Regions:
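Short, glycine-biased loop/turn motifs at secondary-structure junctions and
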Residues: 1-237
Length: 237
């Protein structure tokens, strides 16, 4: 991930939407990106609320991570505060981004959860999925096996085993849907994180790589961004 100056911007990220920034920032990553880009502020309740210069699938994935991440993990997203505005591209590129987010989620988010749940063969199949068709098929198998194991564990009173299997079913179901909806790719990480918290780092890396596909945001001067964020914090934006 490219190094930036986000660590000195002193902006707090929160889950949910926010009508206006507070003295410490207090917005989601998409709202913070609006401020940093110098665009008129708006509350973001869904990725459709983002300005048209924001890539829809990348905005949806970032928003999904923002709302699902624990407070201690969410600051990782400030690495993208300058990269969402100007990322919108033609439909073919946006479709490529959706496919990348989904395929990467199957290959990199599901395997550690599947291993933990005692499904190493499925974990290896996810890791080695060569394309979207294979990844969808493996995710479908994982969702079915996770659901079946969760039910069987519940009948035996094996609650922890059942919880892991249920997490597999939830995350794998989201992975299958992610090929049509980028927000569901974030739900893959959310479903796995209860048992494999390190997946947040993987999810952030996936977003970083997805932002390298197609059009990229123009670089901005640090001083200009700092002034915009300071003005928003003080209510002058």
């Amino acid at each position: 991930m490219a190094a930036g100056f986000e660590h000195i911007l002193n902006w707090r990220l929160l889950a949910g939407s926010h009508d206006f920034p507070g003295p410490d920032g207090g917005t989601c990553i998409n709202e913070a990106a609006i401020v940093a880009a110098g665009l008129p502020y708006r509350a973001i309740r869904a990725s459709a609320d983002c300005p048209p210069c924001f890539s829809p699938p990348l905005s949806a994935y970032a928003l999904g991570l923002n709302d699902a991440m624990p407070d201690a993990e969410r600051p990782r997203l400030m690495a993208f505060v300058l990269r969402l505005s100007g990322s919108a591209d033609v439909p073919a590129v946006e479709a490529e981004r959706v496919a990348f987010l989904a395929l990467a989620s199957v290959r990199r988010i599901l395997p550690p959860l599947l291993d933990l749940a005692g499904l190493p063969t499925l974990a290896a199949a996810c890791d080695g999925a060569a394309d979207s068709d294979r990844a969808r098929a493996v995710a479908r198998d994982a969702a079915w096996q996770g659901g079946a194991r969760a039910q069987e564990a519940s009948q035996r009173g094996a609650w922890r085993q059942g919880a892991r299997a249920a997490a597999v079913a939830r995350a794998a179901t989201a992975a299958g849907k992610a090929f049509a909806d980028a927000r569901c790719a974030a739900e893959v990480a959310e479903g796995a994180a209860a048992f494999v918290p390190e997946v947040w780092a993987s999810a952030v890396a996936i977003l970083d790589e997805a932002l390298e596909i197609g059009r990229r945001a123009a670089p901005l001067e640090r001083a200009l961004v700092q002034r915009r964020l300071d003005a928003a914090r003080s209510g002058l934006a």
